[in-house]
A protein has these predicted regions:
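Small/polar-rich, solvent-exposed N-terminal microdomains that initiate assembly or binding
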Residues: 1-52
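Amphipathic alpha-helical segments
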Residues: 5-16, 80-92
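Short, cysteine-centered beta-strand-loop-beta hairpins and adjacent loop/turn segments enriched
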Residues: 48, 75, 122-124
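Acidic-leaning, charged glycine-interspersed low-complexity segments
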Residues: 81-125
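Short, solvent-exposed beta-strand/turn "edge" segments of beta-rich domains on protein surfaces
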Residues: 53-57
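Oligomerization/assembly interface segments of phage tail-like spikes and tubes
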Residues: 58-71, 108-120
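Mid-chain, well-packed structural core segment of small domains
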Residues: 65-84
Length: 125
């Protein structure tokens, strides 16, 4: 069985521009320095069956929130743009929702976006 969270994470880590950025799932590591940028991948629910045939699920639908945090606003936006292009290349597109804000408590800018996508037919997710 494949795991879409791992697929997304691996795709992001392969990119030369993102390979030195901390990429984690669910939450930003507390041990990361305040000024370091990070990417956090959060599933917004379990995979949903979408294509069915012969009483079987043939494809799954996934929804993820990708949070990019950085000390500089434009750095966070540039990282999020690279994330967007990589996700498009694997069949995910931006959906409604998200956040663009500066948090005084952490002194970081956050650009959080929601992405949706489907597995290919017959892939085992």
């Amino acid at each position: 069985m494949k795991d879409m969270l791992d697929e997304i994470s691996s795709s992001l880590k392969k990119d030369d521009h993102l390979k030195n950025i901390c990429i984690k799932s669910f939450e930003r590591p507390e041990s990361l320095e305040k000024g370091e940028s990070s990417i956090v991948i959060i599933p917004l629910g379990p995979p949903q069956q979408i294509a069915k045939g012969s009483n079987k699920s043939l494809s799954k639908h996934f929804i993820y929130q990708i949070n990019v945090e950085g000390a500089q606003r434009m750095e966070a936006k540039n990282i999020q743009r690279k994330v967007e292009l990589i996700l498009q290349s694997i069949g995910f597109y931006q959906a409604e929702g998200g956040l663009e804000e500066y948090f005084k408590e952490t002194t970081r800018y956050v650009d959080a976006r929601v992405y949706e996508g489907n597995s290919m037919l017959y892939e085992d997710f």
